[in-house]
Amino acid sequence: MIKVPEKIPKKKRIILGPLSRFLLKIFKWDITGEIPNLSKMVLIGAPHSAMRDGWYGLLAVLALDLKVTFYGASWIFTRLPSLITFSKNLDKLGIPWPLGWLQKIILIRLGGVPVYRVNSRGTIKAAIEKFSRMDNYLLLIAPEAGTELVPKFRSGFYYLAKELNIPYVPVEIDFKNRAFNIRSPENVTSSFEEESKKIISIFEGVEGATRVFTMSE
């Protein structure tokens, strides 16, 4: 297990921390690389090809006692994953169940922020306004914005990093080696398209849960 630098936002969890470290060991998952010793950054994870990415990702966050804010599709906060799509509404995927209200409370307390994909206008602007007033934060985003294969990244991570003047840190979700590989931090120095090409070259060939990462602009 890697060490967490002193500037990183942390939240000590007496039960969930040790339990998550135990579960990662049982599942034979590891966390490699180094977290930059910075008080503000955006972690971007890929390839995001299955809902179990989120499960292992949550275990990693809890195992390291990180205090994070993560953005996820609104339906994952109240519904259960399903292999069959019952609705064309992107905010109503999955299967509703009686404890959806409790699921939402738990995920929000862990740092989750629901993103309504049908009407997501203003989400990034609101986030920029919120975090510009904070001294430390750790943001988590899946730039593919879903588990399906997409032709390009969503631009949210780019504008967060650019407007907040913070680095973004690529994290490989590597199912072949059962590891979250933390790469070197990157600063926004060019257009969204150019930054995307840079990140694509980092993630290219990484084996996710159901597919190998590939993307052609």
Predicted region positions:
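N-terminal membrane-anchoring alpha-helices
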Residues: 1-30, 214-216
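Mature, function-bearing regions of proteins
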Residues: 208-212
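Soluble catalytic domains of membrane acyltransferases
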Residues: 26-205, 217
